[in-house]
Amino acid sequence: MALIDSNDFFRPGWWIRSAHLQTVWGRATRPRRLVAYRREVWETPDGDDLVLDWLDSAPGTPIVIALHGLEGSSYSVYIQGLLALTARRGWRGVAINFRSCARDPRRLGQILWNRRPRLYHSGDTADLDFVVRTLAAREPVTPLFAFGASLGGNVLAKWLGENPGQRAVAAAAVVSAPFDLSASARHMEKGLGRFYTESFLGTLRPKALEAAHRFPEAAAKIDLRRTREAKTFWEFDDAANAPLHGFAGADDYYARASSLPFLTAITTPTLCLSATDDPFLPPTCLERARVAASSAIEFVTTARGGHIGFVGGAAPWRVRYWAEERALAYFDLHAPAK
């Protein structure tokens, strides 16, 4: 495993050294529409809709597959920022919207519901696998790269470990991933983590309740009272997310969905970027992931950067997003020579 002291690479802006400012800055200040997508809706093997948002370029150019975080979408600013950089390289980009996360492009606050009685979860790699295999079959000589942030990073890392012999994805980048879901969930019950937790639960609770309203099969699995009253990730996952997706409970879900046990099996060149001040992760989570990482993983930790932050630049009006730039630079290293 290549371990880099990434302080050689990343310096937060002098004006934004706080982990919490790093975490919220992009969402608070970047435009909600950075790119203009072309939308495709694919039918999944289980008979559902999978919404993919594309940035096009010339046929045959490399494709970057992007996976968003918890309660995000293709319109999450870090996904749009990454794909904007992809387009500047003359490459193509495609953002996968996890089930129940796709947005109406005309009204970004409006969720587009799926047909199946389910939502999404941190260990669900089936849709990523479907997209990779479909693209590889359609364009067998086109280089594919994959980027995942937060929950999407956990999904990507788990998929890479589940498929150690895969050759379709040439390289991957994982940013701010909660490799140990149990440790992350417990960490978010403390201090300011409770603020972030309530922010997420503010959309997760009604989404689960709406799924129960729409689908009798979902209502039969979800504990509606406990879902309404959930104040922590563990309580929500145990009442709704885990049983809805076939897990015995939150602990079973965390154990089976965490990417940590899969890191040792990864053979694809993979860049893992994390900050030790990430308010979503305890430091022990990153240390355990670093120890477990295979030799194919370049594990980069920074002292600062928050959660999917890594905001630099000389001033607030001259901002640079280091993780997005670093991920694309890593893909450049593994792209075929022109």
Predicted features and spans:
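Short beta-strand/loop motif that positions the catalytic acidic residue
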Residues: I266, C272-S274
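Catalytic active-site module of serine/aspartate enzymes centered on a nucleophile-bearing elbow/loop
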Residues: G305, A314-K338
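Short, surface-exposed "cap/lid" segments of acyl-processing enzymes
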Residues: L55-Q110
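N-terminal cap/lid segment of alpha/beta-hydrolase-fold proteins
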Residues: A19-S57, V311-W317
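Alpha/beta-hydrolase-fold enzymes
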Residues: A137-L244
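Catalytic nucleophile-loop/oxyanion-hole region of alpha/beta-hydrolase
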Residues: R99-F145, R318
